[in-house]
Curated annotation (Swiss-Prot):
The keyword Isomerase does not apply. NCBIfam families: cysS. ATP binds at residue 271. Its EC number is 6.1.1.16. This is Cysteine--tRNA ligase. A motif ('KMSKS' region) lies at residues 268-272. The lineage of its organism: Bacteria, Pseudomonadati, Pseudomonadota, Alphaproteobacteria, Rhodobacterales. The gene is cysS. GO terms for biological process: cysteinyl-tRNA aminoacylation. Binds 1 zinc ion per subunit. It is found in: Cytoplasm.
Length: 453
């Protein structure tokens, strides 16, 4: 059997995956808080751990892998959005949960074995908290239940922090119901206008951290193999998960994996910079899901990823070539051992893609198909978008070249810009270089829009 090695955030070392139950693997991923569309950062986490899921299924067999990815459907952000839109919370979370599934499926993300919703596990959360209080790791005060951070000696080891440093260097909520500023909320009271459930501490709702611990315990048991999530969740979310779960006597996760963050054109993605994209934004712009996935897999999960227009164009061009090769009635073969070994080496998707390039260049299209399937980029049929429209753009290329040459002399690029805008609006990619102009029909190409030209 192939040996899989993964970077464990807890030990900061690449370790051999040794399943707790030989031959069977369990995986938990922190899923979305459902109140809006999934942005590209959310999508990276979904794609990365889907790729791990696919590798585990390939090595151990689909029936021997259990993957849990939750929906957080009780949260103050959800409450605020529902209030702002005048909607029922259940309607909002149902709609946005489906959005998430639709968008991630478009990226080739398989549905996990279990997709629990936090609201379905309130009883388990209450029981979990009661156990922590009984063991002295938590306490109740003023309708709240809180975890005593200093009672757990290993607090901070996952993220590499000490409690004293955290207090000195971070803004910590100071509240009268806390014994210590570092204590975190397990349960909090709810007013009449927001969701709440009966509990020994009064009507209220769970804190974010207890949700994942309770759902992981309910579906995977006291100890499981791998816990994943974005690097931004390591502290405080994952640190708090470790504390409350281990304090309860659960071994919790053996290996912790974290994917790094995503930026756009070299800058942090933010609405203020105007570079904030949701998955749906790109799909609606005609960017195929396979292209989005390819770009994400081109960077190792442990490194920051930069989404750029250049990478998108290169990914699309590469996939068009590969799909054209597979259109030739290729007999699909298993992914090669070399490609599987690349993925088994801390999920090195970038190396796996390099291996696929080599297969294409040497005409090994059968293994290419198998490799693309393992990477979630091939389902057995060539996607329609990859077929380049049969159209002669010679006239427009000549016209653009002439206008460009004249503009280089007159320094007036008005006609060039107008023609380029019209071509782009028609779904034509304009590629300019010192060798001339190349016009390439894109996935949204509409020849009707060229008629006025």
């Amino acid at each position: 059997m192939v040996e899989i090695h993964l970077k464990n955030s807890k030990s900061r070392k690449v370790e051999l995956l040794q399943p707790i139950e030989p031959g069977r693997v369990s995986l938990y991923l922190c899923g979305p808080t459902v109140y809006d569309r999934a942005h590209l950062g959310n999508a990276r986490s979904a794609v990365v751990f889907d790729q791990l899921f696919r590798l585990l299924r390939h090595v151990y067999g689909a029936e021997n892998v259990t993957f849990v990815r939750n929906f957080t459907d009780v949260d103050d952000k959800i409450n605020a959005r529902a209030l702002a839109e005048g909607r029922e919370i259940a309607d909002l979370t149902a709609e946005t949960s489906q959005w998430y599934l639709d968008d991630t499926r478009a990226l080739g993300v398989l549905d996990p074995n279990h997709m629990p919703r936090a609201t379905e596990y309130i009883a388990e959360m209450v029981a979990f908290i009661e156990d922590l209080i009984a063991k002295g790791f938590a306490y109740a005060r003023d309708g709240h239940a809180l975890f005593r951070v200093r009672s757990f000696d290993d607090y901070g080891k996952l993220s590499g922090r000490s409690v004293d440093d955290m207090i000195a260097g971070a803004r910590v909520e100071v509240a009268p119901y806390k014994e210590d500023p570092m204590d975190f909320v397990l349960w909090k009271p709810s007013s009449d206008d927001i969701p709440g459930w009966d509990s020994p501490w009064g009507r209220g709702r769970p804190g974010w951290h207890i949700e994942c611990s309770a759902m992981a315990h309910a579906l995977l048991g006291e100890q499981f193999d791998i816990h994943g999530g974005g690097a931004d969740l390591m502290f405080p979310h994952h640190e708090n998960e470790v504390a409350q779960s281990c304090a309860a006597g659960h071994g919790f996760a053996n290996i912790w994996m974290h994917n790094e963050m995503l930026q756009v054109e070299g800058k942090k993605m933010s609405k203020s910079l105007g570079n904030f994209f949701t998955v749906r934004d790109l799909l609606d712009q005609g960017v195929p899901g396979e292209v989005i996935r390819f770009v994400m897999l081109s960077t190792h999960y442990g490194k920051p990823m930069d989404w750029t227009e250049k990478k998108r164009a290169e990914a699309e061009a590469t996939l068009r070539k590969w799909y054209a090769a597979l259109r030739q009635s290729v007999a699909e073969q298993e992914a090669t051992p070399h490609l599987v070994d690349s993925l088994a080496d801390d999920l090195n998707t970038a190396l796996a893609i390099t291996t696929l390039h080599g297969m294409y260049e040497t005409g090994n299209f059968g293994p290419l198909a198998g490799g693309l399937r393992l990477l979630g980029l091939w389902s057995g049929t060539v996607p329609d978008w990859s077929e380049i429209a049969e159209v002669d753009l010679t006239y427009f290329a000549g016209r653009f070249s002439s206008a460009r040459a004249e503009a280089m002399v007159t320094k007036d690029f008005t006609d060039v810009d107008a023609l380029k805008s019209a071509l782009t609006a028609a779904g034509v990619e304009v590629r300019m270089s010192k060798d001339g102009v190349e016009l390439v029909p894109g996935p949204t190409f509409d020849p009707a829009k060229l008629e006025d030209l």
